[in-house]
Each structure stands twice: as C-alpha cells, then as structure tokens.
C-alpha cells in the first residue's frame, strides 16, 4: 500500500484489456470538502464484450506489465467472432428498477423542530435542521417559510419522498461473421439510466468492432476499436459539498416535510427561496437539482492492433500497439442568488487524457526429451499525455444564457501531466516431465519522472511449482490434481512528473494588462528521489478431490515496501504545501483461501458452492526520521484523520479520546457535567478490513438455474459524520435520554424565577463517568446536563461515539434464469434465455446505522470517513437473451 499516490496513479490492480493497459483515471472523487465522482475507465467496458477475466496477483505480475502493475493485474479478454457459425446475431436486453436500500431508521418521533425544548414564535426558519424542540403537539400550529400554517405533528419518513423509482435499460446487439480464417464481430450497446434522485440521468453508448485473420498461416492479425459516449446530467454532489442533497436532508426536522421544499424552492422572480435563515451549507435540494446543475460528456476511444509473425513452429515475433484516448467535459453551474454563489458561477473543466502503449516480443518455445523450455525477450513503451483546463466564471449578467459570455469575471487554470516509461524485459520458462515448472523474469524500466542516476531500475522475479499428483501418480479419482507453488519478486515504481525541479505557469492575474507567470509547484522539488522498492514472496497449494468436485486453493504471501515516496506537509513560510522524500517501510502479510465445490451432481440437478476468504495484515513498520504518523485523509471537523501510524496497521483513525483515569472511567468536569477529552490525538480505530469473504452458490435443474452472491467484510471501522449530525441535531433515538427530566427541571426553574447559574438541575442527562475529588480520588458523576448541550459538546470534541465497526454481510446479486428448450425454438433461434435479476437486494447484517456500510469519502485514502452518504440502491429487473 503506497503512502502517497496521485490521481493518475492506480493503487489498485491494473486493468489490461487484450494486452493493452486501460486508462482507469478517476477525474474526480469526494474528499474532506466534498466533490463529485466523475467515473473511471473500467466502467466504460461493455460487459457484453467480455469473454473472460482473470487475476495475476501481486508484484510477480509486474514482470509482464511493469511497475504500474505492482498491486496485481486484472486481465480482461474480449470476445472475437464465434467460430460456430458463419453468421450470427445476438440480442441482449436488461431492464431494472431501482429503489432505496438504506433509509434513516434510528429516528426519534417524540420531539420536533426547535431548540431548548421550544419553538420560538411562529418562525421556524432557524430550527428547520434541529430536533430539540417541544414534544409533538397537534394543537400547536406553526407558520412556515412559505406562509402556510400547519400543525406541529410528526411526518414519518419525511425525506423518503424526495427519492423516486429509478430505471436502467441496457440493450445490446451483436453481429459476427466468420469466413475461412477471418472473423469480424461488431457490438452496439445503448444504456440509459434514470436515477432515484430527481432530475438526474445518464446515458452511455458503446460501439465495438473487432477483426482478426490469419494470412498464409504465417501472419496473425487482430484489430479492435471501441468508441464510448457517455452523458450525465446532475451527478450528485458528495460528502460535505454544499450541494449534496443527502447531507442537506438527513437532519431535516421530523415535523418538516421535504415536499414543502419542492413546491417552494424559488420565488416568483426565480430567486432562491430562503427557508432556513439562508444557511449556505444546508441548501434546498430542489434548488440544487434545478438551479445548481451540472452535466458532463465523455468520449472514450480505445484501439489496439496485434501483428504476429510465426517464423516457424518454435519462434514467433509479435508487436502490439494500443491507445486509450479520453475527452471529458464537466460543467457545474450555480444560478444567481444561490447561497454561497450569490452572483452566479459557472465552472467548466476540460480533461484530455491520452495513453499509448507499444510492445514488441520475440517468443521461442521448444522441447528436448522430457524438458520443455521457452524464452521471451521484449520491449515496451508506455506514454501518458494528459491536459486539464478549468475555467471559472463569476458575476453573471445575462441570467437566461448559461455560457461563459454571460459572466464578467473569468479565471483559467491549466495543468499538464506527461510521463513515459521505456522497458526491456526477458523471461525463461522451464518444465520437466509435466510436473516441475520454473519461471524467471528480469525487467528494467526507465522512467521520465525520476532523476538521472535513479531513473533506471531493474526488478527480477522467480517462481516454481511442483505438480505432485502427476509425479507420484496419485489415484486420479481421489486426487486428480495437486500442486505446490512458490514465488519471489521485486518491483520498483516511480512517481508523478514535475517533482524534480521548478515548473512555471501563467498567473490568472496580470499587471497593467501584462500577463504574469508564477511557480506552479506546490511541492518542494526533490532531485534525489529514488524508486520505491517492493519485495514479495508467496507460497501456495492447489488441490482437487473426488473427480474435481472439490477444489482448494491456499495462498500465503508476504510483501515489504521500502523507500516509499512520501508527501510531507511543510510550513507555509516555505512557500510550498509539502515536500517529497523517500522514507517509510510497510509490511503486508496475509492468506487467501478459495474453496470450490459441487456437493450434488445428478443427471438433471447440480449444486455449486464456492467460498473465498482473505485476511491481510498491513503494518506500518517505519516512517521518516522524527515522523510517527502520515496523514492520508482528514475529516471535516474536530481534527479527525486517517493516517499511517508507525507500529500500527495502515489506515488508523486518529482523534481526541475521552479522558480516562487508570481504571478506564471517563473523567467528567465537575462544574459542567460534561466529559473531558485528551489534548492529543489517539488511535481510535482502523479503516482496513481484518478479513473479507464471499460465497457464490448456483442451483441448476435442467434448464432452470438459481444463483446468488454473498459479500462479507469484517473488522474495519468508520467515522460516520452523518451519525454525528444526527446526534448533534437531536434526530437520533439515543438523544431522547434525559430530555423529559431536563425540560421539567427548566419549567421548575422558570416558575421559581431562578437564574440558570444559580439553579441545580433536578433532571436531565447524566454522563456515565467520574469526577475528580480534591484528594485525587474519583467519585461517581451525578450532575444533570442538558442533552442538547451534551451532544453538541460531544460532536465538537471527540469522534468516539460515532466510530462504528463497519462489518457487514450483503446479498450482492440473485439471478433466476430459464433457458428455453431447443425443441421449442430451433426453427428460428439458436438459444433463448430469460432471467430475473436482483442486485444489492438486501443487507443481512450491518452495524453502522442509517447508511450503507460501503459509504466512504472514496475508495482510496478516504476509507474510514463518511459524511452525507446518498442512500444505496437495490434493483430488480429482467433480462432476455436471444441468439440467432
């Protein structure tokens, strides 16, 4: 796991499609202050074009695909023209309907909006997101922001009506033809989605053409081109973005109906209708979806060509070239009078990413007696050329025309990302007697992003396996397959470009009309950077029993990364935000187990049951000199962060803890009745999973099959700022404790005419803890406090009550399929199948309240932090597949 990675680097497994790396860049994701998920590259791959997927694990895969694959490779092979028929047509259609999966369930319906147990006068605007008012009373009437007087009653599930039923349709047509040694396959897919959020939709159209042929049995040619067009309207803002509709709705008082906001989001002049005291961080979600719109368009071109010359039966030479070119435009608009953007704003982001990959290989295979051997030598050129331009326009003067010309103030920022890696590599493969195998590789990369002297690095690998079932001639009925394997690999990796020296850019400001330039670096250049080094070792055992009806695959691995390239924060007086250094050491150890079984097999019925399990320990052994922690991501409030902490597992959640005595009891301030917290930040949890697992099952009876996929993740923690908000605003059920007693005490105080400072409360919330006595001993705390004051204090001081074990068990998918019998359709069709599909239908177990446990800022450094999560979706639908 790297301590630092850029948006252009991939900390996950590398995707390779038909031998060509995929540009899986994410153009945007949520963070501390919000953001948008702008998608990635792999989502553009058409599932109907995929023939197979396989995984090359760990750094051993880097020998083939370079340092970009240091975390493994997902190999995707796409379909060619079918050789079964000279001409074939396939139609595939899927329609699903989406509904909310997660809802706000832990909600109290005893008290409504307001503060201090009261609702002030008839004006509700300043408490619409607070649930600390009086008890529900149908006899109490309030005049709301829209001028309508309504009774003070609970509106159950008051935010659910905001979400609608979504729908997704995907239609694919495939045409393929084969003649002699030539095949052509063409695919067109149309996908359209109407999201559960109002006024939100997307479409994606994909055209794929692949042709392959053999000339004179000597030359193999394989060409493929794919074009994808994607359009999205109103991607939802995430996390703490002011336009995040989920964040703005989740604390809405239970006596407040969201549909009032729908009917009154703007006034007669088209201006923002103030409903909550013009809170710039809690906007009317209907204004957001209609007047703070965004839209994006993306064009993706992928092309590849393979030319292979078969010199003779032993030697072949091949060249593969590929390109992945992406053009994306994202436009975000805020109409005038939008809180925070009163004069209006338009921001247009233009991304132009180009990735090129060329590979040449000479492959020789032969045998001598019982030996089989092969030698491969080759070279690779990998080049990235990305450009970004962001235009921000402010002060709108022509409100009816959403275009740059309608704004008087414009600012342009541009960015360039270019890098190139040239590689040479070779491999030797030996086999003896079909039971002993030995492979060795050596690869050298020359990176443009590292300094001279350190920009060329070698990394070797060696692996071996012993097929003992073949060597010992074990009874094939009992043990048809048994193999042990071992491997060792070393891999180096580079960093982003422009880290070695100063770079410059045009300043958005000018002097007397003349353009100014400025230093573009925000990180102190480091001309002595070295490549990161990772050493890994792996042992494995593969077994198959009882005529292959039981299969077991066990892997133990260890991996140590050193010379990590770390980005450390610097003081503002340096003129930079950070500096890059080589430091740090992280050690991974883990096991992976896969069990594949067929418990039942008869003539008409079979049952397949597959189970997988993985456990990983990711220990931070060492950081830099004098550095004990390295921040990965920070939360919005109270100095909570996810970090790499020396001596701890990667992904520690740090924050202030309750101050405790030696017995572990919470120490309470005797004067206020509120708990004390530590001055320093402490490890309160960890964002990484202790273990993960999955279960797939498939029942087949003749032409009917029923399959299900279960997902299990255990042991990670998450700091839920949504829960923090729910407690702070009095919406959670747990905030009921002490309210009745405190409000009764306050009535007694008011009747007695005593000031609050001179009154000893007779009821309220009592913190479970101790107070320190003058002699240093501790006594039980018995002081009553206002529950509203208590939860506001907790929300502002410590994250401890809002850090949850994020373990869960989910049903990811259920499919019921029926394949029509041949005798019914053979005169017209080759095959027809119909299926019922349920995706993410329900969560069997989760511990975190109200939200989906998969909710995080993002899937990278933001794991372990959550705020304002949109409800996850469950979908039900059907699929029809017809082959001619």
Model-based region annotation:
Residues 133, 204, 210-219, 224-229, ...:
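Extracellular/periplasmic, surface-exposed regions of secreted and cell-surface proteins
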């Amino acid at each position: 796991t790297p301590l630092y990675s850029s948006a252009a680097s991939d900390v996950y497994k590398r995707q390779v499609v038909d031998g060509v790396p995929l540009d899986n860049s994410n153009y945007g994701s949520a963070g501390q202050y919000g953001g948008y998920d702008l998608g990635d590259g792999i989502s553009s791959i058409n599932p109907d074009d995929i023939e197979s997927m396989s995984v090359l694990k760990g750094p051993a895969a880097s020998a083939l695909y370079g340092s970009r694959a240091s975390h493994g490779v997902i190999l995707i092979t796409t379909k060619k023209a079918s050789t079964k028929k000279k001409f074939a047509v396939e139609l595939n259609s899927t329609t699903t309907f989406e509904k909310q999966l997660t809802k706000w369930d832990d909600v109290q319906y005893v008290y409504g909006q307001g503060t201090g147990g009261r609702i002030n006068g008839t004006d509700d605007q300043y408490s619409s997101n607070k649930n600390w008012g009086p008890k529900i009373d149908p006899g109490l009437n309030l005049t709301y922001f829209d001028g309508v007087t309504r009774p003070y009653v609970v509106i159950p599930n008051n935010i659910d009506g905001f979400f609608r039923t979504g729908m997704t349709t995907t239609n694919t047509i495939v045409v393929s033809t084969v003649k002699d040694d030539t095949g052509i396959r063409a695919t067109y897919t149309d996908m359209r989605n109407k999201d559960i959020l109002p006024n939100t939709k997307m479409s994606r159209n994909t055209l794929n053409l692949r042709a392959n042929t053999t000339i004179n049995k000597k030359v193999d040619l394989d060409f493929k081109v794919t074009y994808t067009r994607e359009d999205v309207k109103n991607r939802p803002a995430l996390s703490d973005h002011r336009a995040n509709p989920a964040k703005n709705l989740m604390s809405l008082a239970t006596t407040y109906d969201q549909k009032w906001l729908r009917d009154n989001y703007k006034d007669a002049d088209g201006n923002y209708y103030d409903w909550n005291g013009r809170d710039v961080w809690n906007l009317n979600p209907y204004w957001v979806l209609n007047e703070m719109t965004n839209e994006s368009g993306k064009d993706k071109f992928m092309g590849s060509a393979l030319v292979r010359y078969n010199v003779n039966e032993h030697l072949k030479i091949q060249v593969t070239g590929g390109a992945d070119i992406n053009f994306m435009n994202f436009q975000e608009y805020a109409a005038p009078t939008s809180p925070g953007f009163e004069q209006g704003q338009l921001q247009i982001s233009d991304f132009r990413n180009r990735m090129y990959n060329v590979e040449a290989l000479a492959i020789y295979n032969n045998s001598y007696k019982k030996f089989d051997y092969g030698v491969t030598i080759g070279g690779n050129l990998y080049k990235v050329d990305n450009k970004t331009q962001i235009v921000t326009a402010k002060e709108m003067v022509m409100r009816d025309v959403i275009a740059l010309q309608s704004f008087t103030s414009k600012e342009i920022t541009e960015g360039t990302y270019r890098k190139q890696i040239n590689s040479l590599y070779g491999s030797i493969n030996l086999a003896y007697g079909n039971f002993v195998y030995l492979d060795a590789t050596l690869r050298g990369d020359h990176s443009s992003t590292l300094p001279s002297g350190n920009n060329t690095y070698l990394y070797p690998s060696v692996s071996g396996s012993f097929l003992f079932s073949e060597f010992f001639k074990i009874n094939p009925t009992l043990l048809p397959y048994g193999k042990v394997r071992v491997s060792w690999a070393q891999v180096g990796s580079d960093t982003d470009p422009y880290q070695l020296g100063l770079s410059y850019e045009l300043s958005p400001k000018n002097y007397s009309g003349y353009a100014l330039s400025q230093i573009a670096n925000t990180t102190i250049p480091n001309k002595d950077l070295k490549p990161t080094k990772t050493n890994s070792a792996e042992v494995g055992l593969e077994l198959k029993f009882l005529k292959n009806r039981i299969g077991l695959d066990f892997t133990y691995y260890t991996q140590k990364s050193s010379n990590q390239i770390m980005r450390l924060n610097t003081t503002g007086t340096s003129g930079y935000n950070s500096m890059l250094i080589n430091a740090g050491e992280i050690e991974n150890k883990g096991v992976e187990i896969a069990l594949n079984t067929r418990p039942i097999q008869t003539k008409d019925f079979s049952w397949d049951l597959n189970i997988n399990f993985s456990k990983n320990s990711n220990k931070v052994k060492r950081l830099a000199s004098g550095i004990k922690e390295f921040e990965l991501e920070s939360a919005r409030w109270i100095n909570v962060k996810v970090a790499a902490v020396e001596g701890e597992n990667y992904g520690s959640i740090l924050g202030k803890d309750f101050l405790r005595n030696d017995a572990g009891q919470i120490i309470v301030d005797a004067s206020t009745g509120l708990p004390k917290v530590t001055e320093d930040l402490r490890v309160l949890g960890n964002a990484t999973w202790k273990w993960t697992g999955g279960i797939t099952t498939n029942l087949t009876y003749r032409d009917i099959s029923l399959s299900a996929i279960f997902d299990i993740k255990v042991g990670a923690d998450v700091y839920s700022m949504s829960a923090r908000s729910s407690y702070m605003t009095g919406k959670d059920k747990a905030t009921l404790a002490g309210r009745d007693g405190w409000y009764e005490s306050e009535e007694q105080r008011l009747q007695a005419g005593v000031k609050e400072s001179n009154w000893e409360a007779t009821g309220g919330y009592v913190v479970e803890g101790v107070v320190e006595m003058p002699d240093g001993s501790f006594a039980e705390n018995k002081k009553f406090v206002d529950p509203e004051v208590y939860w506001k204090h907790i929300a502002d001081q410590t994250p401890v009550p809002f850090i949850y074990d994020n373990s869960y068990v989910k049903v990811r998918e259920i499919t019921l399929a029926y394949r029509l019998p041949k005798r019914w359709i053979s005169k017209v069709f080759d095959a027809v199948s119909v299926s019922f599909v349920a995706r993410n239908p329900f969560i069997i177990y989760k511990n975190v309240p109200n939200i989906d446990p998969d909710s995080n800022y993002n899937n990278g450094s933001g794991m372990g932090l959550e705020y304002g999560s949109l409800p996850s979706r469950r979908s039900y639908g059907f699929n029809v597949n017809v082959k001619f």
